[in-house]
Amino acid sequence: MSKVWEFFENMNEAVYASDVDTYELIYLNKTARNLFHFKDKAAYKGKKCYEILQQCSSPCAMCTNKRLKPDEFYEWSRFNPLVNRSFLLKDTMVIDDGRRIRIEIAIDLDIREMAKKTFS
């Protein structure tokens, strides 16, 4: 799937991927790495998504993993106090060599709102 990650790397939206069964982080694109202050991929590889993205010690109560299905998106919104931003979240599941992978695209609603005000 390394070619797939190249597609997401330079998106303005934050994108992350994690193993649905183990919660292990697999990928954060450049926007997500900057948002969470990671200089390189080694800083998050193998860590749990809930530890890094929410600073929790166990899976998040609002985790959508159980709602995810291949070829469908689940959309929801959430404020993340770690980065002090509101996001529209688009989650899906892909299966790669039998491994269930969650991909989340986070659209920063605060930036969108600022842009609307600037260009109105």
Describe the residue ranges of each PLM region.
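Terminal output helix/cap of sensory domains in signal transduction proteins
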Residues: K48, I52-F79
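Sensory modules in modular signal-transduction proteins
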Residues: M1-R33
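Hydrophobic beta-strand positions
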Residues: A17-S18, R78, M93-V94, A106
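Per-ARNT-Sim (PAS) sensory domains and their PAS-associated C-terminal
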Residues: P70-L88, V94-R100
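Cysteine-centered metal-binding/redox modules
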Residues: Y23, F87-K90, I103-E104
